[in-house]
Regions:
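Short, conserved charged micro-motifs
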Residues: 20, 93-98
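Exposed loop/turn and edge beta-strand positions of beta-sandwich/beta-sheet ligand-binding modules
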Residues: 43-45, 84, 123
Length: 143
């Protein structure tokens, strides 16, 4: 792989309460919150959390979906729900730590899957969980 190709910049997740969602992603998933103070002060429309140095998850309130029609007609009716899940690839240690944190916070997780195909080939292990707003995530590791 080269560094000059397309990269995933961000994914917008529809959430009921952006501050609560940021708390979930920080405390339970272990992601760094961004722009929380600016959101609380009304300076930005939504906060985000950092997935890695190149990718963030935007935590947009549900009521913003109505505004999607002005940008792309018909988008408000489907915004967010055609997505099946988002997969996050981690090291084996981070994978195990995430599963432990989720369980400690009472978040249901699926049994392990083995050998599921993804961007880097077949994963050693993977599992699924959902956030408080119903967004589904897969966690996996290849090492």
């Amino acid at each position: 792989m080269t560094n000059s190709g397309p990269r995933l910049d961000h994914v917008v997740l529809w959430v009921r309460d952006p501050v609560a969602a940021a708390g979930f992603y920080e405390k339970t998933v272990g992601l760094e919150p961004l722009r929380l103070d600016e959101f609380a002060a009304g300076k930005v429309s939504f906060p985000s959390v950092r997935l890695n140095e190149e990718t963030i998850l935007d935590l947009a309130p549900y009521d913003m979906a109505r505004g999607m029609n002005s940008m792309l007609p018909g988008a408000a009716d489907s915004a967010g729900h055609p997505v099946n899940h988002i997969c996050v690839s981690l090291s084996a240690a981070a994978f195990d730590a995430l599963r432990t944190r989720l369980q400690e916070h009472g978040v249901p997780v699926t049994d392990f899957s083995h050998g599921a195909y993804g961007a880097r080939g077949n994963a050693k292990r993977s599992f699924y969980f959902h956030d408080p707003d119903g967004n589904v995530f897969e966690a996996r590791h290849y090492d």
